[in-house]
């Protein structure tokens, strides 16, 4: 049976929970789309998060890796198109690290594109009635760090395994403490992940539909 690795993060920036992990953990050891799903919680820490990710990849030998992270302020499931080779932390990570303008991989490419069918995932989510869009930036914090590190590692291993990153909004419980911020219920995020797992396994070539942005 094929394996899909789904990662999420521990809470950060004073939050009591991270909705990415709340949504991901319930999928651990479940069968979705004919594949076994394994879940891994990453530290919200530069470098350490990649060490944990690489160990999980080595242990589980997945066919697909989907990394998930919280992005408070996002209004929908944001499927990331690209990761850039820079750390520029507006806040410190969970161990007090705050790198500014440092490369994730010395002499690595400026960017990597997701190897998941990004637009097909968005299309499938919308068909399922779940708000979704293509995102053109994963930021410059630990989420982008993990996405770039993931894609670099998979490229070094011959691009046999496909991977990418997805940002999700606050949970309603978090949004209650951040008045005016959008949110998405955790069960809906979990349902979205199931849709994306199935689509990622079923489709390797992306669809040619618009997903660009003006700014």
Swiss-Prot record:
Q: Which family does it belong to?
A: Belongs to the peptidase C15 family.
Q: What is the protein name given in its UniProt record? A: Pyrrolidone-carboxylate peptidase
One GO MF term:
pyroglutamyl-peptidase activity
Mind telling me which PANTHER family this protein's record contains?
Answer: PROTEASE FAMILY C15 PYROGLUTAMYL-PEPTIDASE I-RELATED, PYROGLUTAMYL-PEPTIDASE I
Highest rank taxon of the organism: Bacteria
Residue numbers annotated as active site: 80, 143, 167
Which top EC class is named for this enzyme in its record? hydrolase
**Where does this chain mainly localize?**
cytoplasm
Question: Reaction catalysed by this chain?
Answer: Release of an N-terminal pyroglutamyl group from a polypeptide, the second amino acid generally not being Pro
Which organism does this sequence originate in? Pectobacterium carotovorum subsp. carotovorum (strain PC1)
* Keyword Nucleus found: no
Q: What does this protein do?
A: Removes 5-oxoproline from various penultimate amino acid residues except L-proline.
- What is one Gene Ontology biological process annotated in the Swiss-Prot or TrEMBL record? proteolysis
Describe, as the record does, how this protein assembles with itself and its partners.
Homotetramer.
